[in-house]
Amino acid sequence: MLTLCGVAWTGDAFGPALGVLRWPLLALFVAMLAGLALHAVPPLLGLGLGAMRRLGLARRAGTGGRAVGAAQAGAPQAGAAQAGAWLDMVPSPGRSGVSDGAAARFGSDGRLAAAGPRTAVLLPVCNEDPARVFSAVRAMRASLGDAGLDDVDLHVLSDTSQAGAAHEEEALFRALGDPGVFYRRRTSNTGRKTGNIAEFCARCGGDYAFMVVLDADSLISGATVGRLMARMAAEPRVGMIQTIPYAVNRETLFARMTQFAMRLYTPLWAEGAVLWQGPGANYWGHNAIIRIAPFLEHCALPVLPGRAPLGGEILCHDVVEAALMQAAGWEVHLDPTLGDTFEEVPPNLIDHTARERRWCQGNLQHMRVMLWPRLRLMGRMHLGAGISYYAAGPVWVLFAMLLGFAPAAAARHLAAEAWPPLLALVVLPRLASLLVVLASRRQSAAFGGRLAALAGVMLDQALTVLLMPLNLLVSAQFVAATLGGRSVGWSTQPRCDRGVGWGEALRLLWPFLAAGSAWVGGLALLLPGHAAVLLPALAALLASPALAVWSSRVSLGRLARRGGLFCTVDEVAPSRELRQFRRAMAAEREPDAPGPARRGGVGPAFPGAMTAGEAGLAGGVVPVRQRADSVAG
């Protein structure tokens, strides 16, 4: 519907004046609108659902009426309704939202009232900072004890290949002395994270009913684990429940802006996503609980025919596992009401782009997976959404290139008509989230106040616009490289506040600067009438190395924090688990602390390791030396 409205808005802009480019431009424009609409619908649905609830048009589950779209009290739509008033979507410090069915299993102190099936928390790691890993283990074990879940075991599943890191992992495990923590290291990380989890299931799966799967940078509270267990026990047809992990702990300007954006924009998106996905939600690979028996029976992943990058092992396994779980008749739910579930994000633009390169290859593999028989509609939609996200870059670039060769008057008319619907689909979801926050004093306080939240959104939007030319070119190049047969390694992601130097930024970004400058310069020479439109895009592209360097600075991140910018509730009022984890990490980083943690996050975790930016971009951009090791996940 949004796509059709956008096409109708343009009127006669796609008229005969465009000549032979008329229909190709229209097809690309429809694809651009559809891609933006796909991501704009959930937050707008969330806003509408919240407004209806506030006006009394949609009742909460358990109040004598049905939530809008809920088929039963336990459906995920009802779970969204139980989250509270529509302006109360950010969890209060130390509190996690919980559905009525799960709450019945807890006492007034938050402890589990009755013993349920056994659960294991899995922490897969590969060549990570051991101090960071076991600081998280200590924090989560303490939190599980506080929730009365001492019988929940925590398994550190190591694929670490570097001898120094492996030795330190084993030493920290022995020093922990906790009978509820188990450590296992594989000598060969066959299958990466998928193989790591599969080995655990084959070895220990019969001992547990559920597993809470984390990433190496994840953190989750005991209370949230208990609520996940309770809901799984109460709803026997649910195979997976995905929580929403929020980004924490990084201090660079780039990472703090990312953490701010995730905290501000995600709740409204999640409200709408629960409404339209129902029991056909997605799995993101971590911070989720899984019923082990059907996972073992139905979610084993085959090796795709052919060679990498489109063949071989499935890299982005999570969405495929969710699709297989649904195909077998099991439900997959997204539960945005659960708080105290966290992850970390890349500290800078270079590392973020390297991760996108890996994810691009993994999602393009799903073009083959979508053809598998027996997959359900929602499973195929999630696979298609990932593909369309990365296909958007080439579509936008091709549209701009073709528009440059259209007659000048017709091109200017089309640009003027096409820009408003595209801009609306980008801005409206963010504006809706901002309005929700500004309307609530409590929520705006979690972002440093109304003025700080407004300023943060404006600066975040400005950086998004400045980086758009680079991001589109990068995405287009990644897709072209993958389809052209260039595979990428899966290297360990930095878990520290790594800064980017001028040399690294220029070395890794110069192909995009050269390609963009040549294209814009050539069009300006061939079509002087388009120069005024092209120059702003060229200026933003040329500024991208400086943006990559400056946004990676911890000093600027801390300066923004002192000024009240890009604050989140996890800084203003952090949970007990975050405080425990940060204290443990601070102790490990004291000058007399042993091991790689002493370096305070200024480079790769161990000597000889490449940065993630170099390793990830090498797969499709700059030929630099490769690593033999790979990360679990």
Describe the function of each predicted region.
Residues M1, L122-C126, R132, P373-V395, ...:
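Loop-to-transmembrane boundary segments
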Residues M1-A73, A78-R111, H382, G386-A415, ...:
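N-terminal membrane-anchoring/stem segments of glycan-assembly enzymes
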Residues G48, E356, M367, L371, ...:
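A transmembrane-helix-recognition feature enriched in membrane-embedded lipid enzymes
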Residues E504-L506, A515-G608:
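C-terminal amphipathic alpha-helical interaction region
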